[in-house]
């Protein structure tokens, strides 16, 4: 019973620490370019929308490859 209580308290404490750190670190990322998807997609040679993207193609799609038609498609706009 004591071990169960200790485990529950430890989990709650670690969860609280995670939430506190997540709130404090918003907007303070030092190297934003490392996580930028636009720079990665510009630097990567990719297949444009409307072209074949099956298993024999060595490049990746700029958007996503449709699993049924094997045609590259752009991501839908939100």
From Swiss-Prot:
Report the function annotation for this chain.
Omega-conotoxins act at presynaptic membranes, they bind and block voltage-gated calcium channels (Cav).
Disulfide bond sites? 46-62, 53-65, 61-72
Q: Where in the cell is it found?
A: Secreted
Q: Which region is the signal sequence?
A: 1-22
User: Which GO terms of the molecular function aspect are on file?
Assistant: calcium channel regulator activity; ion channel inhibitor activity; toxin activity
Q: Which UniProt keywords apply?
A: Calcium channel impairing toxin, Disulfide bond, Ion channel impairing toxin, Knottin, Neurotoxin, Presynaptic neurotoxin, Secreted, Signal, Toxin, Voltage-gated calcium channel impairing toxin
Query: Where mainly found?
Result: secreted
Query: Which organism's genome codes for this protein?
Result: Conus striatus (Striated cone)
Q: Is this entry keyworded Disulfide bond?
A: yes
Q: Which GO terms describe its cellular component?
A: extracellular region; host cell presynaptic membrane
Propeptide positions in the record are 23-42
Q: What is this protein called?
A: Omega-conotoxin-like 12
Into which family does the record put it?
Belongs to the conotoxin O1 superfamily.
Q: Which InterPro entries match?
A: Conotoxin, Conotoxin_omega-typ_CS
- Tissues expressing this chain: Expressed by the venom duct.
What is written about domains in the entry's comments? Answer: The presence of a 'disulfide through disulfide knot' structurally defines this protein as a knottin.
């Amino acid at each position: 019973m004591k071990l169960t209580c200790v485990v529950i308290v430890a989990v709650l404490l670690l969860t609280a620490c995670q939430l506190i750190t997540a709130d404090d670190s918003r907007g303070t990322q030092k190297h934003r370019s490392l996580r930028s998807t636009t720079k990665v997609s510009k630097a990567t040679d990719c297949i444009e929308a409307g072209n074949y993207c099956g298993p024999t193609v060595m490049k990746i799609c700029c958007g996503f490859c449709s699993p049924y038609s094997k045609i590259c498609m752009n991501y839908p706009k939100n």
